[in-house]
Amino acid sequence: MSVRLVLTKGREKSLLRRHPWVFSGAVARMEGKASLGETIDIVDHQGKWLARGAYSPASQIRARVWTFDKDETIDIAFFTRRLQQAQQWRDWLAKRDGLDSYRLIAGESDGMPGVTIDRFANFLVLQLLSAGAEYQRAALISALQTLYPECAIYDRSDVAVRKKEGMELTQGTVTGELPPALLPIEEHGMKLFVDIQGGHKTGYYLDQRDSRLATRQYVKDKRVLNCFSYTGGFAVSALMGGCSQVVSVDTSQEALDVAKQNVELNKLDLSKAEFVRDDVFKLLRKYRDQGEKFDVIVMDPPKFVENKSQLMGACRGYKDINMLAIQLLNPGGILLTFSCSGLMTTDLFQKLVADAAVDAGRDVQFIEQFRQAADHPVIATYPEGLYLKGFACRVM
């Protein structure tokens, strides 16, 4: 008999709506003992079966649902089916957009909670972010090897969130060859170097692909400021769009060096690209005090908020940085501003940008809205999957 997690009366409603999380406060008791990440059955207070998920005794999210099908077991065949379902959509996207790299598995939205898999050319980069995902590591890797024999698999589970569930950070080659220091990939007609071993996240921000493409329409003959530039995806896109100059700002010299190489890789005019190692907040104030002006500003900061207790401070940060950007824009200029913080709702982010415009003494029109690229889908029963939001704003 399998271990059962019994819910408190009335706490089954979210599972009946097929939300994939069970929080600790919803648990009445455990029947049997389960190890970290082990698959358990989830039942209501009367013993009615609801779902099958992974158990994490120390996490606020006490269980993450693998399946709502009582007849489905969590094994190699399960992961093979999930991967095949996900691949069908990515095949269509890759053909439509000319991609050789994409997010293959987007966690809960692809029915694999705690699992992130990005494909960069013939490398699969794996992140196992939950105890259940780690527990199923062998089955998942076996399914990947069967479906993708041409691909090497590299583990980037070196993410601090693993510590919250009592797991160590891991990184290294799983199967196949070691990724090169810089791997070239393609998106929307441009080539970009990706650092799988040492780069942010899995090596690159695939979720901003469509936003990078959208940037091109705003930059013809314009002076562009690219804040938090990382390895220069927005800068390359701006140059491909015909900008007169793009200034990329980041605190990492290594990232800026790769950004320069990305400009050269695409045979673009390097004289139109400037790379500045500096703190964005400080530099924006310096530019403001010096009277610098730009026609387009890309504001793509890292996550400012990890938990609800940080939300107030994050709001101040987002408002301040957007206020500074608005002050630096010429009349009619375009601000492309983003938030990747899941706790920051789209409505709240829009309000913060509007408040920033008031503080800057400028009128702003919202002219376009952005979200994560389509290889980062959001399943209807898990709205938390929508984490990236952005706006194109015309500053009067």
Curated annotation (Swiss-Prot):
Residues 2-81 form the PUA domain. Its EC number is 2.1.1.191. It catalyses: cytidine(1962) in 23S rRNA + S-adenosyl-L-methionine = 5-methylcytidine(1962) in 23S rRNA + S-adenosyl-L-homocysteine + H(+). It comes from the Bacteria. It is an enzyme of class 2 (transferase). Belongs to the methyltransferase superfamily. RlmI family. This is Ribosomal RNA large subunit methyltransferase I.
